[in-house]
Amino acid sequence: MRAAALTIALFLAGCGTSSAVDAGWEGTPTDASFEGGSVNLADAYPTADPNPDASAPSPDFDASTSTTFTCTGKTLGSGSHDENVSSGGLARVAHMHVPSSYDATKGAMLVVAYHGFSESGYAQEIQSRMDKSSDAKGYIVAYPEGIATSWNAGDCCGDSWTGGVDDVQFTRDLLGAIEADYCIDPKRVFATGFSNGGFLSHRLGCEMSDVFGAIAPVAGVLGEAPSSCKPKRPIPVLDFHGLSDPVVPYNGGTPFINIGMGIVFRSVPDTLSFWVNENGCLAPPVTIFQNGDATCTEWSLCKGGADVVHCKIDQGGHQWPGGVALPIVGKCSTDISATDTIIDFFEAHPLP
């Protein structure tokens, strides 16, 4: 695994221990140290995985992984490299991880994983532990870099937002470059992301449902007005969020810690309600997974099979469940693997 290009190296413990499950929606901060505090989020991101063999359980989804998509003339093979692209007059890059099982003649699944605010693609690579999953399951991962370590996700965050960077067009340009170099199955392209990258995942669900089979935001909410989110088709959504997230509060509002942005976030329940209504889900919510502090609820019988699943973490902080824990921002669960759950969900929801 390549080293993360971060300026501050911190000791990172493994994800925290589990606690009793709270079946309700309501969540409030439980750590008094969050109240009135402040944090430089750049200080919280990982430079190395302290426990690369860690694993956690995940719910099962019916996989649909077979593909008949084939290619000729693709020149790049397995390993890691930087995919460089010009978009909107800006030089952009994504770090690629391609498993050794990759066959340049057969369509591979592609996951685009967006980092959090003040983070980097390298940090997302380490925090999510997605490379290990990629090697085991044979899919390709792209870890894009945001301008000034941020993404324009509609109403958030940083210089990309205030400067009007077009990260949707960047995503389209990046996918074009990746597909020119690798054999990618166009029906198995997916988006996930953490925090600001989770916000962007929601936005891509609104604006690129014709490209992505499904989205899986972690610790992010819908960052644009619901009235402006008009997917071309119902898109499956898998969402992760901690009930005690101090950065993007579960019930919305301003962060419980000072992250240097005067933003009022939409709540997780409101975000989920939007997707459930947008996808026309008819079945009442059903619990499909419960282990320790992790509970996953599914809304099904949705238009086009676009199920909505929400995994909430009791007392969970601003974390990637089952991943490398970030200090300062609350508890990280070991009772579910966000990465394994996301990949299983993606495999079950190819583009129609």
Residue positions per predicted region:
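A domain-start/cap signature at the N-terminus of enzymes
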Residues: G16-T30, F34-P52, A56-L110, T192-L222, ...
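Short beta-strand/loop motif that positions the catalytic acidic residue
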Residues: D239-H241, D245
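Alpha/beta-hydrolase
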Residues: V112-Y114, V218, I313
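Acidic catalytic loop of the alpha/beta-hydrolase fold
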Residues: D245-V248, H318-W320
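Sec-dependent signal peptide recognition
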Residues: M1-A9
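Serine-hydrolase catalytic machinery in alpha/beta-hydrolase-like enzymes
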Residues: S80, N84-F190, F194, F199-R203, ...
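C-terminal motif of bacterial Sec signal peptides marking the signal peptidase cleavage site
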Residues: L12-G14
